[in-house]
Amino acid sequence: MLTMKDVIREGDPILRNVAEEVVIPASEEDTNTLKEMIEFVINSQDPEMAEKYSLRPGIGLAAPQIGISKKMIAVHVTDTDGTLYSHALFNPKIISHSVERTYLQSGEGCLSVDREVPGYVPRYTRITVKATSINGEEVKLRLKGLPAIVFQHEIDHLNGVMFYDHINKENPFAAPDGSKPLER
């Protein structure tokens, strides 16, 4: 079982590397790692489990965050309309995105970042992601709102990008041009 001890923190060079593609069909080892990742995210949202194992609540996790430089992500997030998006994916890739941008009014956080980083993180409002599911099936997901933001955040990790790299350094709270805020 993964715990916060397994989550590496900013400053570790692996978080700045471009992760490797996972060979499909995935090995048993990669599949088990991905299972542990989604289990961690789900457990972190369960108050009892989070307290018992000192887990920081999270809605997504990328393999580089646990020291594995491979393209794997786990996301477990509920949209504003109550729809649950729970996915454990190999080799996720954004294949299209909207012109319209958004940002979380409260800013973004990260399990690998133990400090508050103030500022707006510009994201695409809608994205389409292509990936391979944990069961080995090709999937294509059309996402908008919070799930789209979470997927962009996790896919950034696979490319060595941290959320705060997107924040305007001169004016952290400048709303990105033509964007609409998303409240969480």
Swiss-Prot record:
Fe cation binds at residues 110, 153, 157. Binds 1 Fe(2+) ion. The active site is at 154. Keywords: Hydrolase, Iron, Metal-binding, Protein biosynthesis. GO terms for molecular function: metal ion binding; peptide deformylase activity. Its cofactor is Fe(2+). Signal peptide: none annotated. Its EC number is 3.5.1.88. The keyword Oxidoreductase does not apply. It catalyses: N-terminal N-formyl-L-methionyl-[peptide] + H2O = N-terminal L-methionyl-[peptide] + formate. One of its GO terms (biological process) is co-translational protein modification. It is an enzyme of class 3 (hydrolase). SUPFAM superfamilies: Peptide deformylase (SSF56420). Removes the formyl group from the N-terminal Met of newly synthesized proteins. Requires at least a dipeptide for an efficient rate of reaction. N-terminal L-methionine is a prerequisite for activity but the enzyme has broad specificity at other positions. Belongs to the polypeptide deformylase family. This is Peptide deformylase 2. It comes from Bacillus anthracis.
